[in-house]
Structures are given as structure tokens and as C-alpha cells.
Amino acid sequence: EDGTVLFGTWNCLYSYANLQLKKEEGLVPPISVICTSGNETFALGPNGIWQHSENGWKQLNYPIARSVRCAETDGKGSLWVGTDAGIYFCKNGKSTLYQNTNELISAYVRAIGFAPNGNCWVGTMGGVAVRNDEKLQKKITPAEGLSNSFVTCIVPSPDGTMWIGTELGIVRFDREYKPSLRFSRRWLMNDKVNDIAFDNEGNAWVATNGGVSQIKRNTMTLAEKEKDFYHQLMYRHIREPWTCGSVYLEIPGDTASWRHEDDDNDGEYTGGYLAMESFRYATTKSEDAHTKARKAFDFLRQLQTVTRTAGFFARSIVPPTWNKLHDGNRTYTPQQIADELVKDPRYKPVENRWRLSADGK
């Protein structure tokens, strides 16, 4: 709480405060796990458990397995230690081991976290066991919404939601154990989550194998949310001659590198956009909505008129300067045509899929 940072290393425990790095005395390295709550701070490793006090570090005589993987304290004198042999509940000089399947999901404990109601969530190979001091309360496995059986960390958020890091993203569980998944590059630099921490504003900082991701807490009204999404729609997805289409990223994960692309569903997407603007006009009588709905309708009509036929519709319209197209014009060798016919006897090669409009635009 005083801003001191502790580092457990191969040869000692170090503290960093006031721009000074200090080697802590009285511990036997290596130190692999550090946990703190309120005024209680513990350091653990294969050679024992130490607790910090005003007089320095004192070793605690708790008989536990040497394979320490994680630890948490409830701030009331109790210490939970996860090992490869199960989880130890340490208090008043005594340690109790829980390792059976009626106590945990498995004995390979990798993460511990305390829920607001005081229950201890134990992440193991196989899922999460929710315990109180005495018995198992609930098991959380992929059947209950966990994204992966390999749990890496468990951290309560400021609002009481339990965030469970796995090797396949994050699953958040509310007080009713309802899950919600945070997964893929939409949320994370990499799906293998190593740790989670929350700042004073409730934002989550997630350490992954691909870097650190920030999941920000943002409160908004429904009207504000609509305004944000509508801005993104108009800025990114509307292109001339008023097509509502998809985009792609030139650099994966870099949203600033977006570019327009053609899609054979451009008519369908623009039709959905036309319906949206029509509903907006019907509700608000906004002239802006009326104008944009008319432009969308004109594009849908142009899909037919641009072909200069009685009933043939184009799938999309793009500028002639585009050089990156889906299903671009190409030629086929006799061997390629034969290969396609073997796969699909009804196959018909079309070499000239894209045709220049009469106005050349």
C-alpha cells in the first residue's frame, strides 16, 4: 500500500521504493511467489514461507509441498498456498491439505483468488473449484462456460466480477456464475493469458504471450453507444457511390490500417443499412437520415442499371483504380480447367468477372 514493489528472483527477494533497489534479508532463495493483502505480505519458494513485519522477514513453520505455484492471503491471518500436490490452508501454525476430487477438481493448483463473499476460487488443471474454509461449494469447468481447462490466474475486479485467465482467453463470472468471454484480437494481444491486474479506474491490464492488453471500463448511455457505432459506420464502412461494405486491416491488429474491400454481399449489407436509416427517419424525421436512405436506395438501383441489362444485377461496384479485388479477372490453363471440372462437373470458368462501366468510373 505504500508503493513499494517486491521482486522475487533466483537469488533473493528485492524491494524497490523511492528510486532505491534493496536486497531483503532473512529469506532463502529462490522466491517464486509473493502475495499481499492489507498489512500482510508473504514471500514463498521451494525453501519455505516468510511473512513480513516491522522487524523484517520471519519464516513460518508450515509443512507444505515444495512445489509452490501460487498463494493468496485473506488479510485475516489465513494463507492459501497452491502446489502440485493440492492447496494448503495455513492458519495459526497449522496447515490443512485439500487434494481429493471432492475437495478440488485436481491437485495441480495454478491460481487462487478471493471472491467478495470470501469464497476461495482455486484454479487447477481442469477448471476452477470454489471453496470456503471448510468444503467445496462449486466446480467450474468448460461445461459451465470456462473457455479452457488450463487456468493461469484468478483476479476479482473492483465490481466483484471474477476474471479467470486461461490459455484461451479470459472468462468473467458474475455473482450468479454467468460467464462472459474476452477472447481473440478484439480483446487481447494473445489468447494465452499470464496475469491480470486492475488500476484505480477499474481498467484491466492483461499480460499475454503477445504483450499487454488493456480492457477499459467505459460507462455510456444507449444513445451514446449508438452515436459511437454510427460514427464508426460512417467513417469506415460507407464508400462511394454510397456502398455500406466491409473493410480489412493491412496490418493485422492495427485498426488504423483499415481499407475498403469489395464483397459480393455489398447489396445485402447496404440493404440492411437502408432499413436502418429508414427506421431512423420514421422515428426522428431527421433529414440527414432521409438523405442517406435515398443514397443507399440509389446504390441498390445502380447495381442493376450499371450492367445495362434488363434484369442482371452486379454484385458490387468499385473504382477502376482498385488493384486488390476478390475473384479478380484472370485466365485459366487447360490443366486448371480440367482440375476444376473434376472437383465440380458443373464448373464454368469465368475470366472476365469485373467489367468497366459505361462512364469509366
Predicted feature locations:
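Carboxylate-rich, polar loop motifs that coordinate divalent cations or form catalytic acidic clusters
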Residues: E1-E224
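Intrinsically disordered, compositionally biased low-complexity regions
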Residues: R217, K227-F229, R259
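Long, well-ordered core segments of solenoidal/helical folds
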Residues: E224-D254, K292-R308
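Alpha-helical packing segments of well-folded alpha/beta enzyme cores
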Residues: F229, Y269-G272, M276, A296
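Solvent-exposed loop and edge beta-strand segments that line ligand/cofactor-binding
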Residues: T255-T270, K361
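Well-ordered alpha-helical scaffold segments within catalytic/enzyme domains
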Residues: G271-E287
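Extended ligand-binding groove/face enriched in aromatic
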Residues: D288-K361
